[in-house]
Amino acid sequence: MKMCFPCLQCFCSTSDDKVVVSKNDKGGESGKKFRLFSYHELKVACDGFSSKNKVGEGGCGAVYKGRLTDGTMVAIKVLSVELESMRGEREFISEIAALSDAQHENLVNLHGCCVEEATRCLVYDYMENNSLAYQFLGREQNRNSFDWTKRKNVLLGVAKALAYLHEEINPHIVHRDIKASNVLLDHNFNPKVADFGLARLFQEGTSHISTRVAGTLGYLSPEYAVSERLTRKSDVYSFGVL
């Protein structure tokens, strides 16, 4: 079964056939490099997707810690995709569409992807301190070491990321799943908003879109859950819960 990925048409090849450069909405190069990885390369990076390298798992797949041949530590998200039903394909395309041209210090950095038959992988920077959820729901000593200064910095970082997604980048992006497990923390506890599998793009001047309700119970805004009208305020509500 031959697959077509229109979202990858926004990239142009360089002299290295494994590296592409994303284009901005005006047709010019944005300067952000995006790499196409082979499945074998990623399998070697995380020791055959060994369970000892698994750092997380969700409804869309598992995440593994890996080391590329140049020594770069990465997080490899392996999505569960069924080619017949296309389950998981929408999430894969949404993440690439949202992050391929986005550059902000409080967004997780997407290095590239792997597309081989039914395999769909996304490669990100590895976050040494896992997620905000891990810090608060894990060991008690993690919670005790997470002082108010760190908490304030995390909240400010997430707020800056949302302001960038909602106002600065075009098309605008609504994340739809802001929650503690989707806020990753680097070695200095700087927050990085992650997991754009449910994200939706908003063209300039668009106030809302009608779409099926998706997200996490407890973080969903009531008006979105009832009306199925998605706005940027839905992310703001989730941020308030966070």
Curated annotation (Swiss-Prot):
Positions annotated to bind ATP: V55, G56, E57, G58, G59, C60, G61, A62, V63, K77
Catalysed reactions, as listed in the record: L-seryl-[protein] + ATP = O-phospho-L-seryl-[protein] + ADP + H(+); L-threonyl-[protein] + ATP = O-phospho-L-threonyl-[protein] + ADP + H(+)
Pfam families: Pkinase
Residues in the signal sequence: none
Enzyme Commission no: 2.7.11.1
Annotated catalytic residues: D177
A single GO molecular function term of this UniProt record: protein serine/threonine kinase activity
Keywords: ATP-binding, Kinase, Nucleotide-binding, Serine/threonine-protein kinase, Transferase
InterPro entries: CR_Ser/Thr_kinase, Kinase-like_dom_sf, Prot_kinase_dom, Ser/Thr_kinase_AS
SUPFAM superfamilies per the UniProt record, alphabetical: Protein kinase-like (PK-like) (SSF56112)
Domain Protein kinase, first and last residues per copy: 49-242
Induction of expression: Neither up- or down-regulated in response to zinc ion contamination and in response or to mixed metal ion contamination (cadmium, copper, lead and zinc).
Family to which this protein belongs: Belongs to the protein kinase superfamily. Ser/Thr protein kinase family.
Name this protein carries in UniProt: Putative serine/threonine-protein kinase
Organism of derivation: Helianthus annuus
